[in-house]
Amino acid sequence: MELSEMTKDERSLLLFLETQAVDYGGLVDVRRMNEGDCNIASDWNECGFIIYERISFYSIEAVSTPSRRPTHYVILSQEAFRLAHEERIARAVRMFQKRTWKKPGEEDE
């Protein structure tokens, strides 16, 4: 799979899942995903791009907080991590090009 073959929704979901894997130990609160995201994640799970499954029912309470109630976990494959890294760089470039602020010295341009 290549980044250019992925839809905008797929790229966005990949970054979301990468964040869950890195910052939350893989725990995913599916309330932050829409039906399309869940379908994509399931498809990726089936083809081995990621591992995306429910956590044990008894673990849900133990890992929940007032603002997060994870019910699933994700593990990214090496390919998924590679593509997420590529997309982070591409997104940073796009966002910088869309910026509404100016760097010192640009005010006169």
Where are these predicted regions, by residue range?
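Ordered hydrophobic segments in well-structured contexts
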Residues: 13-16, 49-51, 72-75
